Amino acid sequence: MRSKPPSWGHEGIISRHPTKLLPIGLPGTGDLFAGSIVAGLARGVPLPRAVAIAQNLTSRAQDHANALGAGEVVLSEPESRRALVALDPN
């Protein structure tokens, strides 16, 4: 039996998570994205859901930083901080 290609995801399933492309690129977004996924997995959140939550939180953090004119991700918004702690984008 052939092994699965290394590009396959969790449980041998490729999952795609399209999102909007923002017109900005800020330092810290990759750290926030990866950290959110790892935190979700550590709490038992299934991988596809952890990715979706990470996308939502990262997008919101970028929007917030862009609105402030910041040059990096800003997590000072109380709503974002609560969502990060709870790993719930709503």
Curated annotation (Swiss-Prot):
The keyword Chaperone does not apply. InterPro entries: Ribokinase-like (IPR029056). One of its GO terms (molecular function) is catalytic activity. Coiled coil: none annotated. Keywords: Nodulation, Plasmid. Signal peptide: none annotated. Involved in nodulation of a particular host, M.lupulina. This is Nodulation protein NolS. It comes from Sinorhizobium meliloti (strain Sm2011 / Rm2011 / 2011). The lineage of its organism: Bacteria, Pseudomonadati, Pseudomonadota, Alphaproteobacteria, Hyphomicrobiales. The gene is nolS.
